[in-house]
Structures are given as structure tokens and as C-alpha cells.
Amino acid sequence: MAASTEQATGGVEKTAAEEKPRVLEPGAAPFGNFPHYSRFHPPEQRLRLLPPELLRRLFPQSPETRPILGLDVGCNSGDLSVALYKHFLSLHDGETCLDASRELHLLCCDIDPVLVERAEKECPFPDGLTFITLDFMNQRTRKVLLSSFLSQFGRSVFDIGFCMSVTMWIHLNHGDQGLWEFLAHLSSLCRYLLVEPQPWKCYRAAARRLRKLGLHDFDHFRSLAIRGDMASQIVQILTQDHGMELVCCFGNTKWDRSLLLFRTKQATETHPIPESLIEEGKERNRIRFWRE
């Protein structure tokens, strides 16, 4: 997340003792908008946990369910967005598919215009992924841009939302109420939601890096009441406050972050998750159910 282009590129003011600006170390960007995120959190770590057939199983083929519409919030420079697109369509490196955009279309947003511009330039599937600059916490802009995209397909909500390592940055910059509102907006916009919350140790590390570099501390860090086991906190907010149901946890990444799949009660009634997917996941030990 970023508030300005200067912050997005990691620039800081020069001092008398410095001729060049310091460069933010990975993870120290105040809004999570570091320029080479995928170098230290590669997409493959998430992909190995997610069944490639997940979306096809959740949304069986029919005119009403195509294309599957996804919302990727906090897409950074698009590396993970593209990787997810290829993964769920079973596309290999260098491979294209003329019908890909008819099967799946992702709207990917980030607050940093520099990162969004890079994502647009490097995207190998311009017909299937749309990148926009958006401060998701700006209600007016969010409503206009997302409604405009959905109306192109005659839809009012997204089939699935992706919130990958974003919740901490919302929480640190907007406080407890901001996190609650962020999850409320997502749950109202998406029938299914895949969330990768950062654990509390990442909060402490992010704050420590800012202090180490002499940057302004996060306004809300010391006053946050929602803390501790952040995966459980996210589950509680989405299920108890926002009417979603936790379907499963696909496991943890190498850097110890859970991949949690939620669905709205309406989705539960109209499109129950296939039992075959559940059983296959259990057999592969890739899906751990929180209710067990």
C-alpha cells in the first residue's frame, strides 16, 4: 500500500551527510509497496498449496458462471496475479490460450501507480487481467471503479477475491476499525474469498524496520487491540461479523502464512463446494479443516 509515488519508490529526503537517498530494505515500505516483493515471497510457495482445479470445481461450467471474475487486492507489480491466472487455467510458461479471458478474468488493484504501470507493461495476458490504481479504503473511488468493471459482465459481485498478505498493511495504516471495514467490504464484494493473513510477528518486524531506518512509525501499531493469532482473528471477524463461512485452510507457506478460503452463505446455498475436491485435498494433506 502506498500514499504517494515518492513513498512507493522508497525515496527519503537527503541529509547533509548523505548524497544519495537510502533505499528501503525489503518489507520496510510503510504501505507494503516494496518494488521486488516476489523475490523474497515467490508465487510458487502459494501455488503449491492451491489445487489447480479449484476455480473450475467451485464454479462449474455454464453460461452464467463464465468468465469467472476475480478481484486481487494489493496486487503489487502483478507477479502473483499472473501466476495465479496461469495456475488456475493450467497454463505453462510461454503458453497462451485464446479462450483464457472467457474462462477467467481478474481485476487486480494496488495503491501504487508505479507498480501498477509495471504490471500492465509486463502482463502476458492483457485480455484476462486488468490492472488499476486504487486505494481500496477510498469508498467513493472503490465503488466507481469496481462497479464499472462488474457492469461490463452484467455482474454485481466478484466470484472470488484474493487478499494475499495485505491485511497487515491495512491494519497498521487504518487501525482496528479499518481492518474490520476492509474485511466487510471484501465480504460484500466476493462470493468466495482467499485470504493470506500476516502473523503478528510480521507486524513487529515491519515496525522495527521502519524505526531502524529512522522513518515515522505506524500510527496505529501500539494501539491495536486486535493482535496475537491474526489468522484466528481474521476468521472470527469474517465469520462472526460479516456472514462468511470458513471452508478450509490449504496449509501454510514457507514463511508461515495460512491460506484461508471463505465463502458467503449465499454461495453455500447456490454453489456448494464439491465433495470430490474436499476428499482429494484431504488425501493429499493439502487441506486442513478448522472445524475438525
From Swiss-Prot:
**Which PROSITE patterns does the record match to this protein?**
BIN3_SAM
Per UniProt, subcellular location reads as: Cytoplasm
Q: Which GO terms describe its cellular component?
A: cytoplasm
List GO BP terms, alphabetically. Answer: negative regulation of pre-miRNA processing; tRNA methylation
GO MF: O-methyltransferase activity; RNA methyltransferase activity; small RNA 2'-O-methyltransferase activity; tRNA methyltransferase activity
**Boundaries of each Bin3-type SAM domain copy?**
53-274
Root EC class = transferase
> SUPFAM superfamilies per the record?
S-adenosyl-L-methionine-dependent methyltransferases
Instruction: Kindly give the InterPro entries that the UniProt entry links to this protein.
Output: Bin3-like, Bin3_C, BIN3_SAM-bd_dom, SAM-dependent_MTases_sf
| Pfam families xrefs | Bin3
State its Enzyme Commission number(s). Answer: 2.1.1.-
Tagged with keyword Methyltransferase? yes
Q: Could you say which residues bind S-adenosyl-L-methionine here?
A: R46, N76, D110, D135, F136, M164
What keywords does the record list, in alphabetical order? Answer: Cytoplasm, Methyltransferase, S-adenosyl-L-methionine, Transferase
User: Where do the segments described as Disordered lie?
Assistant: 1-22
Keyword S-adenosyl-L-methionine belongs to the record: yes
What family does the entry list? Answer: Belongs to the methyltransferase superfamily.
Function, as annotated: O-methyltransferase that specifically monomethylates 5'-monophosphate of cytoplasmic histidyl tRNA (tRNA(His)), acting as a capping enzyme by protecting tRNA(His) from cleavage by DICER1. Also able, with less efficiently, to methylate the 5' monophosphate of a subset of pre-miRNAs, acting as a negative regulator of miRNA processing. The 5' monophosphate of pre-miRNAs is recognized by DICER1 and is required for pre-miRNAs processing: methylation at this position reduces the processing of pre-miRNAs by DICER1.
How is this protein organized at the quaternary level? Interacts with DICER1; the interaction may be mediated by RNA.
- What is the protein's name according to its record? RNA 5'-monophosphate methyltransferase
* Gene that encodes it: BCDIN3D
